[in-house]
Amino acid sequence: MSRSEEIIEVTNHYGAQNYVPLPIVISEAEGVWVKDPEGNKYMDMLSAYSAVNQGHRHPKIIQALKEQADKVTLVSRAFHSENLGEWYEKICKLSGKAKALPMNTGAEAVETALKAARRWAYDVKNIQPDKAEIIAFNGNFHGRTMAPVSLSSEPEYQRGYGPLLDGFRKVDFGDIEAVKAAINENTAAILIEPIQGEAGINVPPEGYLKQIRELCDEHNVLFIADEIQAGLGRSGKLFATDWDNVKPDVYILGKALGGGVLPISVVLADEEVLGVFTPGSHGSTFGGNPLACAVSNAALDVIIDEDLPGRSLELGDYFKSELEKIDHPAIKEVRGRGLFIGIELNEAARPFCESLKEQGLLCKETHDTVIRFAPPLIISKEELDFALDKVRSVFE
């Protein structure tokens, strides 16, 4: 039995079976490449669901991690820390928002944004107590905690977890008339992924986000953009909402915010929204900890200094155009923006992902029939050509 087989066996024996990973063990990683314990090399075309936009173990991020780890790693929010204010300033100036509230995981940040929206609805908009509603979209993925699960339209994400939370309405993604029909006097917010990731890289119709912005302005409703996966350069823009030149009232960021090293997430908004939180009304022991802030400061610097949004736009256009040239009866559609691309098939995607793994290319199926490609944004054109050769070979 190989070392990889031993690891997989003990993992399956002791671990809850809530994941079905590809049968590969990753023991080393650098840039866009990973290795298994046997020394086999693979190209990472998933980036931990966009958490590794800067590439594995980016030297600037690792250096920031090491330097901070030698000083202080955690103090809780009971005390001030040296670099939280610096990180606040950087992320607020980058987003154009006045206030930031840090958490750890994406789901925590979504929960935080929903709490802010509800409290804003009661304290600012004067919706009657316990009547606030939030509109979300079919096909959404906002996390695995109870509020995001209650928002989901995926039966398996909800099965056995009832009673689900109330106060949510769901409409079809891309249907502006459905959004109009769902808005009423109790609507507090519209929560949307500017590009739906888990649903299969679903890109909204051109101008759709602008229409939502206009509806929110007309009805005094908060526009909440979940940019956890599509943001921070992944779509070819710094924020995926930039494709429609709109600014949401609330940004939710995570994943690449931690540079593929530590979990850190944030809710960004102006004083009117985040000002609803008072001392004791929300919190997180690890949220905004010194180690995460140091890592995130470096992660943001890499995104800007290396123009990762621009790289994603240029290389994504090339990659998508080359994928569209592949003529195979199983391919239904190629879609995406930047280096955030899905190949929708008319059959199961898993066997193709397994074949690509055998070719040295790691990716993951989503919603059964879509192959998702989201490589680190530091990838070179030559490395993309390597990936294209492997993709072409499995469709021959």
From Swiss-Prot:
Pathway: Amino-acid biosynthesis; L-proline biosynthesis; L-glutamate 5-semialdehyde from L-ornithine: step 1/1. The modification N6-(pyridoxal phosphate)lysine is found at residue 255. It holds the Pfam family Aminotran_3. Its cofactor is pyridoxal 5'-phosphate. One of its GO terms (molecular function) is pyridoxal phosphate binding. Its EC number is 2.6.1.13. It catalyses: a 2-oxocarboxylate + L-ornithine = L-glutamate 5-semialdehyde + an L-alpha-amino acid. GO terms for biological process: L-proline biosynthetic process. GO terms for cellular component: cytoplasm. Keywords: Amino-acid biosynthesis, Aminotransferase, Cytoplasm, Proline biosynthesis, Pyridoxal phosphate, Transferase. Belongs to the class-III pyridoxal-phosphate-dependent aminotransferase family. OAT subfamily. Catalyzes the interconversion of ornithine to glutamate semialdehyde. PANTHER family: AMINOTRANSFERASE CLASS III, ORNITHINE AMINOTRANSFERASE, MITOCHONDRIAL. This is Ornithine aminotransferase 2. The lineage of its organism: Bacteria, Bacillati, Bacillota, Bacilli, Bacillales. The gene is rocD2.
